[in-house]
Amino acid sequence: MKGLRAFVPLLLSFGIAVSVSAQDASSTTAPTTAATTTASTATTSAGAAQGSSGEEESDAELAKKLNNPVSDLVSVPFQFNWENGINSPDRTRFILNIQPVMPFKLNEDWNLIARIVAPILSQPPRFVDGIGTSGVGDPLVSFFFSPAMGKIIWGVGPAISLPSTNDPTLGSQKWAAGPTFVALRQASGWTVGALVNQIWSFAGPPDRPSVNQMFLQPFVAYTTANLWTYTINSETTANWEDDSPNRWNTPVNFMASKLATFGTFPASYLFGWGYFFASPDDAFGATWKVRGAVTILLPKKKK
């Protein structure tokens, strides 16, 4: 039953996405990056506001780029996740994801965006009377080649999982790689899109299970004139090597974030809650989670 429910949030997210895209089909927008893209104009009325120096990107431009996984904005998010109900209502797993985004301009037409997700985990034991584990998980490094302009923002490239953990319960201990793709549209304050990757293991200890895993993240976000952003997304993982009851992990997240500048230091602050419509039936499946995040921004100077 959990496996079947994995499709519910995906259909919901894509249904909202199609509806919003249809409403905005008559307007135009330029791309941004990061998992979003960059634009020459702001998407909300807040675009008229400029930075204090007049040389930095405006707050509205920064807020727009934060919604774009492939924008030209250098950022360092620190994402804190508390996942509850790990095989028992009172068991919690903590995950800190450090997710730097580094864009590179290849030429006037193309950008290269490097995104890293480096997890640090602390989780309860598989069995209630065991000992928990803490440490570094396997980082995922993604590279997106993205056109600098276009109404539809997109990027494509390779994703590589690095076997950096020394604890078998915190990672696969396998080298894995595959394609990744992101596409989105931004207009009138809305950002609608999806990010997907599929990786397969190709090296590592032979006694460890093979990796054959898909990640799918549809997202819908709306940014207001006062720079509040409200987002709903799904972060679905499908482990194709596992049996059906343990294959799907499908949290749906509801989040609010605010861009704020203290002096000349811009940052985004986020809080959210998520519910797992599907999760593995084994000892590490969660029921719900709380998320907090701080994203440090390094805006580029205007020429």
Label each region the model flagged.
Residues M1-R5:
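N-terminal secretory signal peptides that target proteins for export/translocation
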Residues V18-A22:
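Sec/Tat signal peptide C-region and signal peptidase I cleavage site
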Residues F7-A17:
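Bacterial N-terminal signal peptides
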